Regions:
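Hydrophobic, aromatic-lined core segments that form the binding pocket/scaffold
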Residues: 186-436
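Local cysteine-cluster metal-coordination motifs and their immediate loop/turn environment
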Residues: 16-32, 74-108, 122-130
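Gly/Pro-rich turn-and-neighbor structural signature
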Residues: 49-50, 54-81, 85
Length: 436
């Protein structure tokens, strides 16, 4: 068996820490996918149905939500195997190796790329979102053990060497070019001498430049020069755009852009385990409720639907007032999140809807816009017109639980919606992250 190298991006290692808090948050928000044979193996450990007083241990998902089986949840959304002491009963009684591999890895994410695994994290985990605990390098030994179980025994080196996401649809590049561009994306978002809004606008402009180049015609010796040229040109255009609009009030989006953005807000704000706890007639009612809430959220006026049960009772228009400029410690949290996602390539390829790099960047930018909108909800709930670190963490944890995992966002005409909204991203960024 070919054992792939684990790669931690240096910028992620410098900024990100993690140590399990035993809060069991992941056991309540993570729809745990089961690999072939894992369900049967767990069933053989014990008569779980009798011990837990349940009929169903696993749930078959529809193709719309990803297919396959996941661990069942109770009516409160807790994993059935989570004890009252917030400890996993499988882990406690049978050891770590007895748990599904997805549980063992959480919150780590391994993205195959060019014969390596790029190591990232899920940010719906409180310890990850707050960057508390140990250096990520401390986990390398544990992750290497899990990688052996993660890879099929008949895997060949060439099969994984060939995994490199496209830059755009039908535009392949080699690993050298992909890494060079990806490192530039990290450099742009990490240029914290500039306001976050400007960096996000720069990232979007650079992405637009990437889409115009036929990378198959660029030889390795010219890649670095081409990237530097695009980086400089896109920064110049970004600064000109920001200067031209410095005194221009950014109005809330309306019409078709607001309708499609409202769909994104809904898809990235709903619970990542939504639907797993409702079956039969309750499941039908639940699905009608989803449609109703989405229809409410595509509007600019009217009551804020309770997509999350703790959302405040307010009008959607209350979220469109001007908020105070974002403090640096708040924007730093969002910056760290973006470096974590982009540095670990957790925004494209096999772990992200098989999206090309540019389509993944559009999705990530819409995710950040949604984080800005969710921060407004958190502040409004507390009667504030300024943002806190907790607001940013709430937005990140909510969005990241869906971004790349909720299949609904990538089904049907998803790419058409994505490409349409891409043209409006500068206005969305200026509107919902303009105070940063």
């Amino acid at each position: 068996m070919y054992l792939m190298q684990l790669v931690f991006h240096h910028d992620i290692q410098a900024k990100q820490k993690y140590q399990c808090l035993q809060c069991a948050k992941g056991c309540q928000t993570f729809a745990v996918p089961l690999r072939e044979g894992e369900g049967e193996r767990i069933e053989k450990l014990r008569d779980w149905r009798k011990q837990l007083s349940v009929k169903q241990l696993f749930v078959k998902q529809s193709k719309l939500t990803g297919g396959g089986e996941v661990l069942a949840k109770d009516r409160h959304g807790r994993c059935l195997f989570l004890g009252k002491d917030n400890l996993c009963e499988i882990h406690r009684d049978f050891g770590l190796q007895a748990k599904p591999l997805a549980c063992q890895l959480y919150p780590f994410v391994l993205s195959p790329l060019g014969g390596t695994f790029r190591v990232g994290l899920r940010y719906d985990c409180p310890a990850t979102a707050r960057s508390s605990g140990r250096s990520l390098g401390d986990y390398q030994g544990e992750l290497k053990v899990m990688v052996k179980a993660f890879l099929p025994k008949d895997i060949s080196k060439s099969e994984y060497n060939d995994i490199v996401p496209n830059i755009k649809v039908n535009e392949e590049v080699d690993l050298f070019t992909f890494d060079a561009i990806n490192d530039t994306l990290v450099d742009i978002i990490g240029s914290d001498a500039m306001p976050l809004k400007v960096r996000l606008l720069w990232l979007h402009k650079f992405m637009c430049c990437l889409e115009k180049i036929k990378w198959g015609n660029v030889v390795d010796e010219e890649v670095g020069g081409m990237i530097d040229l695009l980086k400089g040109a896109s920064l110049k255009e970004t600064i000109a755009f920001a200067d031209d609009n410095v005194d221009t009030a950014v109005t809330p989006p309306s019409g078709k852009p607001r309708k499609l953005l409202g769909q994104i807000f809904f898809l990235l704000s709903q619970s990542s385990i939504d639907g797993l706890t409702a079956t039969g007639l309750a499941g039908i009612k639940h699905r009608f409720g989803i449609v109703r809430k989405m229809r409410q959220l595509v509007k600019l006026y009217g009551p804020l639907p309770k997509v999350q049960p703790d959302w405040p009772d307010c009008d959607l228009q209350a979220l469109e007032v001007d908020f105070a400029p974002m403090d640096k410690d708040v924007s730093d949290v969002i910056t760290r999140y973006l470096i974590g996602r982009i540095g670990a390539t957790g925004y494209c390829g096999v772990n992200f809807y098989h999206y090309a790099m540019c389509d993944g960047l559009k999705t990530i930018l819409l995710g950040v816009v949604t984080i800005g909108w969710l921060m407004r909800i958190a502040a409004t709930k507390d009667g504030r017109q300024h943002f806190t670190v907790d607001d940013a963490i709430y937005g990140i944890m909510t969005v990241d639980g869906n971004l790349g995992y909720a299949k609904q966002i990538a089904t049907g005409p998803a790419l058409m919606r994505l490409n349409y909204l891409s043209d409006h991203l500068p206005n969305f960024i200026s509107r919902y992250l303009g105070s940063c």
